Every structure is written in C-alpha cells, then in structure tokens.
C-alpha cells in the first residue's frame, strides 16, 4: 500500500506497551536558517553500523507486534558432549517446530516463533527460541524437543526477564563473535508473524529540532533518542521510543540500561 510522502514526515508505530516515533526531513536543502551538510561517502564501518541498526529495529518491532511480556525465551540444547553442524542443528529445529506446531493446533493455538541458532567455539549447538506462551506450553516444548533430539530439559525465561523486547532484538540480530570461526549467527522466524504498519503524517518543523516530549502516561527512554543527520542518506532525523508507565517492558528497559551504564 502506497502512502503519501511528506517533506517532513512522521512515522509512528503503536504497540501494547510502547510507541516508536521516527521523524525525517526529506527536503533538498537544510532546515530553515541552516545549510544542508554536504553528503559524504560513508565508510564501511558506518554502513555496517546502519545496517545493524536497521536489522535490530525491524526485528524489535516485529517482536512487539506479535509477542507479549510473558511469552517464553527458551534455550534448547543437546546432550552433553554431542556435536553437530549448523546445518544439522537447523534441520533438528525444523522437525521440532513441525511437531510443536501440531501440538499447538490441537489445542486451538497458532505457533509463533523466532530463533537464533548458534554453534559455539567448542562445537556445541544450541537454539535461542522466542515463542508464544500457551497453557502447558513449557511441557509441550520439552516433550517435542526430547522426541527429536533425545535431549532433556530446555531452560525458560519470560521476555521481560531477559531485558525485554529491546534486548531480545539486539541479541538475536547481533553480529557473530569474531573471536572464533565456530561462533555462527543464523536466525529465522515463522511466516505467520504480522509486520507492523506505521501511522504516517506530516511532521512539524519545531518537532524536528526540539527534544521530544512524552505523551501523558508514557516515559521516553533517553537512550532511544537520536537526532541529527544520517551520514548515509544525508537526511535530518529524530527517533525515540516511549514506554507506558508501569509496564514490564519499561522496567526491563530501565534495568537493562542500568546494567549497561554500570
């Protein structure tokens, strides 16, 4: 679906516990009273940083649009001492998902998931698995994984216990560990995840230059506020995220920011 384009554009994404705002100035010149900065050829580092930012942002919004605070973040492992290739590990996960999907549907639910499959430096494969929670879902996951691999007990956390959606998106999309060839990043998601669509409208000039103000009942995460000129596109921008006061997502973000700051 095509949307009307504005010279100053605001895109707003609404989620259960947060609102994400992006403002962009697409004019040929700079803002009034300012000269547009000359666009420079970005470095490889800048390009990779921008690409990683976009990957993380896209996945974070997909997670927010399809999962809730008490859904499961699961670690699926193999028997101690067992070694497998990334290809074999992915095949195991595909079989596991096929079996788990049947169990969900028997109970009237659709399975939604995102997975990051890794093989560590010592060759031990494992899957970090985000999945929608249903009654007795932990038992179903354990039994299905055991049927496929013979392995025992997956470990479970709720999404807000793992730093919230922001931290999960960062972890799932982060680049591989360059310290060893066996640390491999590979993530995928189920096809039934709904892609969020933004509300698009004209942005006001004063909104582009002033520090954002939260809506009543919301808090702006200072670490999410970014304003300036994109070195790759040459466009002025302002991005920030508001979290609903009292939400588990806000608590998770504040706790995560505290750990990073410490």
Give residue spans per PLM region.
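Right-hand nucleic-acid polymerase module
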Residues: 1-123, 133-262
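Cys/His-coordinated zinc-finger cores
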Residues: 127-131
């Amino acid at each position: 679906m095509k949307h009307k384009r504005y010279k100053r554009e605001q895109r707003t994404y609404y989620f259960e516990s947060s609102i994400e705002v992006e403002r962009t100035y697409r004019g040929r010149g700079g803002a009034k009273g300012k000269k547009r900065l000359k666009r420079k050829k970005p470095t490889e580092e800048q390009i990779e940083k921008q690409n990683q930012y976009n990957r993380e942002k896209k996945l974070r919004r997909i997670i927010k649009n399809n999962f809730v605070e008490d859904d499961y973040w699961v670690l699926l492992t193999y028997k101690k001492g067992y070694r497998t290739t990334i290809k074999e590990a992915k095949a195991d996960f595909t079989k596991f998902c096929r079996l788990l999907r049947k169990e969900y549907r028997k109970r009237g639910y659709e399975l939604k998931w995102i997975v990051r499959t890794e093989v560590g430096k010592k060759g031990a494969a494992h899957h970090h698995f985000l999945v929608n929670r249903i009654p007795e879902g932990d038992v179903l996951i354990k039994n299905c994984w055991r049927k496929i691999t013979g392995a025992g007990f997956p470990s479970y956390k709720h999404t807000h216990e793992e730093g919230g959606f922001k931290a999960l998106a960062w972890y799932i999309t982060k680049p591989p560990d360059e310290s060893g060839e066996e640390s491999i990043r590979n993530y995928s998601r189920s096809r039934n995840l709904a892609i969020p669509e933004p509300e698009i409208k004209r942005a006001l000039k004063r909104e582009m230059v002033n520090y954002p103000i939260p809506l009543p009942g919301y808090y702006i995460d200072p670490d999410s506020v970014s304003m300036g000129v994109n070195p790759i596109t040459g466009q002025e921008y302002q991005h920030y995220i508001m979290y609903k006061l009292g939400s588990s997502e806000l608590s998770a973000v504040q706790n995560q920011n505290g750990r990073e700051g410490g």
